[in-house]
Structures are given as C-alpha cells and as structure tokens.
Amino acid sequence: MDVPADSHIKYEDAIDYWTDVDATVDGVLGGYGEGTVVPTMDVLGSNNFLRKLKSRMLPQENNVKYAVDIGAGIGRVSKTMLHKHAAKIDLVEPVKPFIEQMHVELAELKDKGQIGQIYEVGMQDWTPDAGKYWLIWCQWCVGHLPDAELVAFLKRCIVGLQPNGTIVVKENNTPTDTDDFDETDSSVTRSDAKFRQIFEEAGLKLIASERQRGLPRELYPVRMYALKPMPN
C-alpha cells in the first residue's frame, strides 16, 4: 500500500532547511528571484486576482481591510503586493533569519503604520484572533502542513475572518492527480483535486480560481484559490 505523501512531512526538517537558506528574494523563491520573471509575474498575477474579486471582498460593519501574510518569509508578498490592497498587515513566519530580514524589508511600511503584529510561529501553531481579518493570504507555505493539519488550520482561519472575509491560497499544483513529497524542504505539492477536497472538508466555498501565468515552464503550475466560509 502506498504511503500518503503528506505522512513524510517533518516540521523540524523544514525549519532546518529554510534556516540555512539566504534571507533574500532569491533565497525564498528557490533561486527564482531577481533576474528571473518569477517575482514580477507573481505580483502581477496576485494583483489582478484581487482586483477581480474587489466587489466580492467589500468590508462590512465599518471593518478595516486588515490582512495577514501566512508563511511570510522575508515579507516579500506584503512589501510588493499586499500593502496595495490592505490597510494593515500582520505576518506569520517561524524562521528566525527571515524575521530579522523582514524588519529591514518592511521598515518603510511600518513607518506608515501598515504593519501590525509579526508572529514568530508556524502555521500549525497559529490561531488568529476571532473576526480580525479581511484577508488571510497563504502563499507557497501550506505544503509544509499534512492534510489533516491543513484542514484544522483553515478551520481556525474561518474563525479569524471578518464578516465577508476571504482566504486566498496560492500554491504549486502537481500536473497529475497525485501529490508529490519533496524531501529537500519536507513539503508536499498537492493536486488541484486534493486542494478542492481539503477546502470542502474545512467548510470553505471556492468562489474563484485562476492559474498564474507567465512562469517558467520547468516550474510546477501555480494556482490561486479564493475561499469564503460555507453558509451555515
């Protein structure tokens, strides 16, 4: 019997791997940083995706557009994209060298009052404050959670959403219906079908999905998923 890919995940191995990676854009993007199309195309794709969703993401009850950047690395997504959409951003990241660099990268946004809390913790140990977030953004990080832990994490995120809040998951997909385990960083790349199954198990409704365009062909396909809690 085949062993599920996610059963091989070890948090300690992942932390060890990322702690040894350079705290740079090139480091956090696995060598596809400056000098490649990946950072620019990634930001363009995310910006366009959120703009298309704008009318479905209106804050309610005088809430501010408070976002949280999950698996934030050195703060690249917040610095280049999220701050254009959100009034304030919290960040969640367990790797100490990345957090140290994050303070440098986000200094200007912090001076403008756009940076809130920085949580030095892994997703599996993070619980959001109830009703706090307009947007929970998870990019290139949920592969470090086994399936059951990811379902539990998403359920906690639902509690952390404002009324009409949204969760976005932006992740690699396998081009097949099977999941791939990468022992290098102890992570799993999931199929599109597996993600949809996990979202349903967590009680989330998929309101939009789009494939990221313009990335090098040798990379996995990347897909964005916009999610809202299923009606009770």
Swiss-Prot record:
Pfam families linked: Methyltransf_PK
Positions that bind S-adenosyl-L-methionine: G71, R76, M123, Q124, Q139
EC number, UniProt record: 2.1.1.244
GO MF term set: N-terminal protein N-methyltransferase activity
Disruption phenotype: Defects in both translation efficiency and fidelity.
Enzyme class: transferase
Sequence similarity: Belongs to the methyltransferase superfamily. NTM1 family.
Record-given protein name: Alpha N-terminal protein methyltransferase 1
Species of origin: Saccharomyces cerevisiae (strain ATCC 204508 / S288c) (Baker's yeast)
Lineage summary: Eukaryota, Fungi, Dikarya, Ascomycota, Saccharomycotina
